[in-house]
Regions:
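Active-site region of chymotrypsin-like
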Residues: 14, 58-82
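A residue-level detector for short acidic-glycine micro-motifs
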Residues: 37, 72-75, 94-97, 112
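A structural signal for short beta-strand/turn segments enriched in small hydrophobics and glycine
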Residues: 27, 33-35, 83-95
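Acidic, glycine-rich catalytic/binding loops that coordinate metals and/or anionic ligands
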Residues: 28, 48, 78-87, 109-147
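Surface-exposed, glycine-biased beta-strand/turn segments
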Residues: 1-55
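Flexible, gly/ser-rich surface segments that form the specificity/activation loops bordering the active-site cleft
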Residues: 38-53, 90-106
Length: 147
């Protein structure tokens, strides 16, 4: 859910969602764009401040200037590299638990630049009927790699 109490309480994370999943689950692009950041060289995780900047991350730039961010990916599993174009459903990497993390999950957010500051913005999920919805705490969702 948005505005989480544990770690989603600042401008960069306020509208991020954590999606629990098994280690090694393929992560796929939610929108088309260009890969602008790939970091997948860290293997540890923990809940201390030491781990805040250690998460493995892939960021994709979209035509509207926003970025989608996929964090806590498994070390050495990035399939894409900076400069690659991706389409909806393309495999990016595998899920993990790198950096500031208490277990395997995807930390996903949509980010825009606002006054030289990156901030997370609200986004919607789309169900199997094409209906948009906002995630809620403890909501169970099953994903698909292609719409």
């Amino acid at each position: 859910a948005f505005n989480g109490q544990f770690s989603h309480n600042n401008d960069y994370n306020r509208f991020a969602v954590d999606i629990a999943m098994n280690v090694g689950t393929y992560l796929t692009a939610v929108r088309a764009g260009t890969v602008v950041w790939v970091k997948d060289d860290y293997h540890m995780s923990g809940r201390t401040n030491y781990f805040l900047d250690k998460a493995n991350v892939i960021k994709v730039l979209h035509d509207d200037g926003t970025f989608s961010s996929y964090a806590h990916i498994l070390m050495d599993t990035a399939i894409v590299k900076e400069g690659d174009s991706v389409a909806v459903g393309d495999k990016l990497a595998r899920s993990g638990s790198s950096g500031f993390s208490t277990g395997p999950h995807l930390h996903f957010s949509v980010i825009k630049n606002s006054g030289l500051k990156n901030i997370a913005i609200p986004f919607k999920f789309v169900d199997h009927t094409g209906t948009a919805f906002t995630p809620k705490r403890a909501m169970l969702m099953v994903g698909a790699s292609k719409p």
